[in-house]
């Protein structure tokens, strides 16, 4: 019997850790080229796997490191097959699924401030509601058509009908309206968060 002091946040943490313990979720640090299209290619190569966490922050280097959580079938064979597929596609990655520090802390530390931008560029940040179904992220990136430079991305599966993502774009100041027109065409609800105090304090 669960005591009344166990709140929903604690329950969510227990479920998340138990999925890793049962080998249903894997956590990877995976490197991709820092260029337009790489983000979408990774999502396409992941396929119809259920993404539980997806965290990325542009830092000005030639390679981007993605913190990726995936829910797989409850078998070692499923995991081995997936990782072999990544190797065959020439991805460089580290399996952090059994690393306690990563499970406890890294997922909440990954990111930080972005690179210094030239004066004509700004970073615009939006919270976006993604349908909780396989392929939703790939659909979002496909509809954007590699037109926009994504500089920040964090998605967390909350087990609800919609999952929240925080997405940042590096654009010229005059492109804000054009970007928002493209976001409207995708039909995922979004809210501009560029002036958010938390973003300003820790991520800008």
Identify the function of each model-found stretch.
Residues 6-204:
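A conserved regulatory-domain signal marking ACT and ACT-like small-molecule sensing domains
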